[in-house]
Curated annotation (Swiss-Prot):
Monomer. Associates with 30S ribosomal subunit, binds 16S rRNA. Gene3D superfamilies: Nucleic acid-binding proteins, P-loop containing nucleotide triphosphate hydrolases, Probable gtpase engc, domain 3. This is Small ribosomal subunit biogenesis GTPase RsgA. Residues 1-36 are annotated as: Disordered. The lineage of its organism: Bacteria, Pseudomonadati, Pseudomonadota, Gammaproteobacteria, Enterobacterales. Keywords: Cytoplasm, GTP-binding, Hydrolase, Metal-binding, Nucleotide-binding, Ribosome biogenesis, RNA-binding, rRNA-binding, Zinc. Belongs to the TRAFAC class YlqF/YawG GTPase family. RsgA subfamily. Residues 23-34 have a biased composition (Basic and acidic residues). The keyword Hydrolase applies. Coiled coil: none annotated.
Amino acid sequence: MSKNKLSKGQERRVQANHQRRLQQRERGAAHWDDQPLGEAQEGVVVSRFGMHADVEDAAGRIYRCNLRRTLKSLVTGDKVVWRAGSEQPSGVSGIVEAVHPRRSVLTRPDVYDGVKPIAANMDQIVIVSALLPELSLNIIDRYLVACETVEVEPLIVLNKIDLLTPASRTEVEQLMAIYRRIGYRVLMVSSQTGEGMDPFREALTGRTSIFTGQSGVGKSSLLNALLPPEHEKILVNNVSDNSGLGQHTTTTARLYHFSHGGHLIDSPGVRELGLWHLAPERIARGFIEFREYLGTCKFRDCRHDTDPGCAIRGAVESGTIAHERFDNYHRIFDSMAQVNARKSF
């Protein structure tokens, strides 16, 4: 069921109250009905659970907080204004008052709720793939489109390379060269043997990153290898023997800190990242090697398929654009057509 929409007047009042709470924090002011609460302070959301959020204060302490009903959305990584409570019923010890403007936000489409944010304020999106459950260039390309759309730098990480034979390693290196040639950084690592982990740690240092990718590619194992030894280990699931598909270990996005500097948001894995909320033009621009050819096709409404005079297809045929990327571009549109067909019923 769709949610009731606020009127324009209600939206203005909600926004005015939100701005007032941000301004009160800056002035150190408190409202009369907030006296049971402590002073407003800055915090960061480390995880979100329904109508509650875990908020970390400046000293690294974590408080489970209620959310003001006027907050439009709250996700892991959000910078917030919150107040600690004097009592702690049911483990709740504060309330989130307001959310600061986001520097960046990663989203995904939802059939019922439109576009939903996943996490905020990251400056690097780590696209984790692996040989098991399968090496999917399609999912890598989908996440690259998402990265280009939100203008956040991607890092492609191929895990479980300890499973490679010399012959299969050569084949995988050739596939990863597709991305290196167009300017993307690719790291090949193993959380089991430690191969490639030092350059990976260096790439995460001093940045706020988010782990994305398929279920079962080893994001939790990588996180365990990156966190200090004294940190509580993250639960790890294996690939299902029955389906051959990855199983979800992480169920909600959570923010972690590295002792060597930097922060990481671990997000739940997906089977396929939907992009049907994006316009066709934005998807085409999300394939960065297409950009110099966009607008140069013979026909303005070129679909970059079998259309005569298509500049992008010409670049594929000449070897300038990889046919694997071109095929995945069309797979995205095929899946969008299937989603739209289901939504029409």
